[in-house]
Curated annotation (Swiss-Prot):
GO terms for cellular component: host cell cytoplasm; host cell nucleus. A motif (Nuclear export signal) lies at residues 169-178. Belongs to the benyvirus P25 protein family. The lineage of its organism: Viruses, Riboviria, Orthornavirae, Kitrinoviricota, Alsuviricetes. Pathogenicity factor implicated in symptom exacerbation. Might function as transcription activator (Potential). This is Protein P25. Its main location: host cell. It comes from Beet necrotic yellow vein virus (isolate Japan/S) (BNYVV).
Length: 219
């Protein structure tokens, strides 16, 4: 379910609406100490061919890193969290974290150069120190912005008569221990044309949530 946050207008068109959807997920890291999860960022409105003009997608990830390993309570684990995306179509197969880094057994491993040369963008990459017990956690909280349908990086004022491909966004985790659990919430804000939604519109601070390209926030 999503909340309609507000609306802005561009000349000659109906208003755009900001729709927010919150996802929750849990990643249980395998005994190999690394995991990769593809994240589908499309909201219900995006699954139609009627998506109009550019979309600006502002995503806030708030995760709780929890590590559990009996009987070693009181120790801490290191967990590297990465959020990556492919801003254009890429036919390179991705089968897990080992495809994102050169050596998935090392927390300081470099990012796969082949993916980088094919347009891989790293939006977040940080190592967290996580307590190993049931009550402790480390907070991961960051915001990033994607532009255009399918995360394609396109110039301003480019119009799209229909939707394109789904987003290729991946959460990658590398840890130096086993039985770690990553719980996270992701808040997605996407602008859609008002022709896709006929419900109530709430006020929103448009200086916080960026409008689509070519749309005047002050209108």
């Amino acid at each position: 379910m999503g909340d309609i946050l507000g609306a802005v207008y561009d000349l000659g068109h109906r208003p755009y609406l900001a729709r927010r959807t919150v996802y929750e997920d849990r990643l249980i890291l395998s005994t190999h100490g690394n995991v990769c999860r593809a994240i589908n960022l499309l909201t219900h409105d995006n699954r139609t061919t009627l998506v109009y003009h550019n979309n600006t997608k502002r995503i806030r990830f708030r995760g709780l890193l929890c590590a559990y390993r009996v009987p070693y309570c009181g120790f801490r684990a290191l967990c590297r969290v990465m959020l990556c995306s492919l801003p254009r179509l890429c036919d390179i197969p991705i089968n897990g974290s080992r495809d994102f880094v050169a050596d998935p057994t090392r927390l300081d491993s470099s990012v796969n150069e082949l993916l980088v040369s094919n347009g891989l963008v790293t939006h977040y990459d940080r190592v967290h120190n996580v307590p190993i017990h049931t009550d402790g956690f480390e907070v991961v909280d960051f915001t990033t912005v994607f532009r255009g349908p399918g995360n394609f990086l396109l110039p301003n004022a480019t119009n799209f008569p229909r939707s394109t491909t789904t987003d290729q966004v991946y959460m990658v985790c590398l840890v130096n221990t086993v039985n770690c659990v990553l719980r996270f919430e992701s808040e997605l804000v996407v602008w859609v044309h008002s022709g896709l939604y006929a419900g109530d519109v709430l006020d929103v601070d448009n200086n916080v949530i960026q409008a689509p390209d070519g749309v005047d926030d002050n209108d």
